[in-house]
Amino acid sequence: MTIDCPYDEVIHQWSSINVLSNEFIGMHYKECNREELFKLYTENSEGLVIFTLGANQIMYGRKGEMPKFFTPYHVDVVSTLGAGDTFKAGCVYALLKGMSDLETIQFASALAGVAISRFPLPLNPPSLEEVQALIKNS
């Protein structure tokens, strides 16, 4: 898995998942249309491509597919510190557990959702039960 990696890099081409943050896209591809950029990413990898946009819809998919969208879970936000890293950690966990693309997005989104509902995150990390409850109850 990799994060914020250009579409023409070897690491992207061989990654199982590439998570691209809104910040990275805005800095490196500010002139590009998101749908066209997404197509460049998916055409250059067999892996799952994920564009995150904070609280806005997540765009994800694979080569040869139309992009799919997922709206992150609504939670009471206490601090967004660590949200992106937590989402990415959720993708690693999902990859290791063999989750489907949708399950990966759901799990990573729920993990980040639980994480931003508390502060400080390092002293109170999300539990698997909390993540599963957010998915189930949303």
Locate predicted features.
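Conserved phosphate-binding/catalytic region of the ribokinase-like
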Residues: 34-138
